[in-house]
Amino acid sequence: MSHRLAKHALTSVLALIASLNSLSAAETDITIAMQLEPPHLDPTSAAAGAIDNVVYSNVFEGLTRFMGDGSVVAGLAKSWNISADGLRYTFHLQTGVTFHDGSSMTADDVKFSLDRARAEDSTNAQKALFAGIADVEVVDPHTVVVSLQAPNGNLLFNLAWGDAVIVAPETIDGIKSNPVGTGAFTFVNWVQGDKIELARNPNYWGAAPALEAATFKFISDPTAAFAAMMAEDVDAFQSFPAPENLPQFDADPRFKLLIGSTEGETILSTNNKMPPFDNKLVRQALAHAIDRQAIIDGAMFGYGTPIGSHFAPHNPAYIDLTGNSNYDPAKAKALLAEAGFADGFTTTLKLPQPSYARRGGEIIAAQLRAVGIYAEISNLEWAQWLEQVFRGKDYGLTIVSHTEPMDIGIYARPDYYFQYDNPAFQDLMTRLTATSDPVQRTAMLQEAQTVISQEYVNGYLFQLAATSVAKIGVQGMWVNAPTQAIDLTGISWAD
């Protein structure tokens, strides 16, 4: 063999080895794309679902947690006892749990986290989840007692939310940019506008995940999302933003579709304290001006289920109330005239980044214009939407998908961004919280759905479908989305 041929053969062998090493690396690492970049990484102080996409069950954990099928199971609490009167929950914590900085996780951290979430000055977006807690008592390093003001059949469910994760007091100052949790993955790096990197936690208290490293890649543009997936620059895309491309992925043997349900009630949110939306007749007119199916077909290419209230159709307590707000432009015009707006009016329609909002907003604006309502569209980045709409309540209309699980209770919060204030509804939610009987709870949930539907608090559009795309070898990604999360702990590559 000539020197040159031998050199070429050696080069080929080295290239093959490098290729095999690359393949091996790819089978322990994963890159998952998502459309929205989180504003920061503290799930206990903001409503952005993109935060939980990255950190839920990966970096941070709570006493309980959601599984992909929606069930609530043990998390940092390995077990619990409930007193006969339902007022005391004694949680027994997992042993050997450490935070990523090496410090031990104890009952003191649980008390700190729950007290911080329910404090008067708490910035927790779901502070209401903790409102019924009367006291949190440390019994010993691995036992904590949560005392309630009244029985709460939802407590274990509430503690599974991303807003209820356990954090260490000494890490709070840096939590937004350098999160330190107890989860199976540690935070490594955040390149703003590009990606977040996580690595497997070698000291994790539970079962070790199959993945050694994960990268969350942020791709906001639907065209760029399609290009990245087709080029295999990413291994999966959670909630793919261009549903019109899904059939192409389905026909490509390199990929698979993960189509399921979410908790995302997509609504035309209405500022109930801003004239003229403080008038129920105007809100009712809005509801009858909207053709839900046209929005689902035009913006979502058929992926979505019409809803008539703020409740998921796959929930056993769901009732179909879409008939309360059927598409009827003539009725919408008559209601506007009755409300004193025969000539219509102008309002704002502030839209966050997701394609359901941007594409749906264009369709809705045209539908409203047909009955005399002129919606001036303003496209916002997610951080702007949170500041102007969610916190500032400076809007007339907006479109957003509420992806939190079983969140009809937000309508009992008069300070919530759409500012619906109904004492009777608030009383109903209080009674629901104190009720554990499943038959009674179903009846109350159905009453709650009916009340907000008949009050036309918001325009109820559709239940968002889970539409993710992954390479054929990716296993264990959630098909359904019982909460906002990309849970890495069960993801692996096929052998």
Predicted regions and their residues:
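Gly/Pro-rich hinge or "lid" segments in bacterial periplasmic/extracellular proteins
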Residues: 157-209, 213, 221-223, 330, ...
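Alpha-helical secondary-structure segments
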Residues: 106-113, 141-147, 183-184, 211-213, ...
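N-terminal lobe/hinge region of extracytoplasmic solute-binding protein
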Residues: 33-84, 115, 180-182
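Aromatic- and charge-enriched surface segment that lines or borders ligand/interaction sites
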Residues: 79-123, 139, 145, 276
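A structural "hinge/loop" feature
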Residues: 37-53, 76-77, 103, 125-126, ...
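Ligand-site clamp/hinge motif
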Residues: 173, 201-247, 374-376
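Detector for C-terminal structural segments
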Residues: 27-30, 191, 289-317, 355-365, ...
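Surface-exposed binding/hinge segments that line
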Residues: 92, 126-169
